[in-house]
C-alpha cells in the first residue's frame, strides 16, 4: 500500500512538472489547445474598421493652373523651360483638413501622418513605408466616423515622392527617360526603383534629391528649389522645405457625423509644366549634356474635389 501511494505521488509530480506553456485564450489568433499554462503570448485580431469611408484618390492634371509658392499664376522665367511629365506614381506623407484661412498647420483635422524614422540621423520620412499610388488610384480609405464633424474649406497635403517620365535630348537624339524625385522635407531611403534600376542609399536625402534612368544608366542629383503652392501664405504659412501643398474646396465640405455612404475626395494635383530646367541654349529641349539642369520639380497646385 505504501508503494502504491508513493507511485501516485511520483505520477502527480511528473504531471505538474510537464506543464505546457502557450496561449490558453480561445479567442486569440494563436490559441494553443495543447497548452495548460498561459505564457502571456496571446495575440488578437485587429479591430476591423467599418464604413462609410472618406475615399482619398490621387489625380494628376497637366491642364490645371500652374501656380507659384503663393498660389498665383506662374510664368516660366527667362533662360528656363519646362514640361508636363507623365506621372506613374506619387506619395504623400500628411493630409489635413483645415476649417478656414486662419487655421494653422497641424491645428485642423489631421487625416493621415505617415511613418518617420531617425535611422539616417535626423528625423525623416520613412520611404520604405510610403504609400505610392498612380493616377486615379485610391490612396487611402478613412472611416468617416473617425473624422470630426465640422465644416472644412481647405486641404493641406505634404507630398514626398514622384515618379514620372521625361523627354530629353542627348547628342541630337530625343529620348524618354524616367525620373524619381523626393520632395519631402527629409527622406530616409534604403533603396528605390526608378524604372528598371534600383538605387541603394541607406541614408537621408533632403528635399529635391532625384534619380534619373534611361538605357540602364542612372544619374543622381539635387534640384535647387521645389515649388509648394500655398494661397494661405499670408495667414497660415507652412515651414520652408515641408512641401505642404494647400488647396481649397469649391464649396465648403461639411462632415455631420451622420453619413451613411462613402464620400470620394479626389486630390487633383497640377502637373502643368511641373518639371522646370535651366535651358542653356534656349532650344526648349532638356539636354543635360548641353548644360541644362533641373531647377524645380514641385507640384503646381492642389484642388480637392468631393464626389458624394
Question: Model-derived features: where do they sit?
Answer:
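Sec-dependent bacterial lipoprotein signal peptides
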Residues: 1-17
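A generic structural micro-environment signature
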Residues: 7-10, 29, 37, 98, ...
Amino acid at each position: 500500500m505504501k508503494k502504491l501511494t508513493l507511485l501516485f505521488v511520483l505520477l502527480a509530480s511528473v504531471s505538474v512538472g510537464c506543464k505546457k506553456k502557450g496561449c490558453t485564450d480561445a479567442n486569440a489568433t494563436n490559441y494553443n489547445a495543447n497548452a495548460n499554462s498561459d505564457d502571456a503570448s496571446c495575440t488578437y485580431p485587429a479591430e476591423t474598421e467599418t464604413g462609410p469611408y472618406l475615399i482619398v484618390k490621387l489625380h494628376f492634371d497637366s491642364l490645371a493652373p500652374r501656380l507659384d509658392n503663393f498660389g498665383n499664376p506662374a510664368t516660366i522665367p527667362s533662360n528656363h523651360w519646362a514640361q508636363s511629365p507623365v506621372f506613374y506614381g506619387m506619395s504623400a506623407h500628411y493630409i489635413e483638413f483645415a476649417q478656414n484661412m486662419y487655421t494653422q498647420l497641424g491645428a485642423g483635422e489631421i487625416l493621415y501622418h505617415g511613418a518617420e524614422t531617425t535611422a539616417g540621423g535626423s528625423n525623416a520620412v520613412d520611404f520604405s513605408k510610403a504609400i505610392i499610388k498612380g493616377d486615379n488610384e485610391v490612396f487611402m480609405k478613412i472611416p468617416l466616423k473617425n473624422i470630426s464633424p465640422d465644416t472644412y474649406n481647405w486641404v493641406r497635403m505634404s507630398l514626398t515622392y514622384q515618379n514620372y517620365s521625361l523627354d530629353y535630348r542627348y547628342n541630337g537624339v530625343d529620348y524618354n527617360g524616367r525620373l524619381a524625385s523626393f520632395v519631402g522635407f527629409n527622406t530616409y531611403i534604403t533603396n528605390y526603383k526608378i524604372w528598371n534600376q534600383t538605387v541603394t542609399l541607406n541614408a537621408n536625402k533632403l528635399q529635391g534629391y532625384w534619380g534619373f534612368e534611361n538605357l540602364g544608366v542612372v544619374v543622381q542629383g539635387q534640384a535647387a528649389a521645389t515649388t509648394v503652392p500655398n494661397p494661405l501664405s499670408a495667414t497660415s504659412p507652412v515651414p520652408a522645405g515641408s512641401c505642404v501643398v494647400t488647396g481649397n474646396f469649391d464649396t465648403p465640405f461639411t462632415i455631420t457625423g451622420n453619413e451613411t455612404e462613402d464620400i470620394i475626395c479626389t486630390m487633383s494635383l497640377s502637373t502643368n509644366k511641373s518639371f522646370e530646367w535651366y535651358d542653356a541654349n534656349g532650344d526648349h529641349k532638356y539636354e543635360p549634356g548641353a548644360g541644362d539642369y533641373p531647377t524645380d520639380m514641385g507640384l503646381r497646385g492642389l484642388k480637392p474635389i468631393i464626389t458624394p
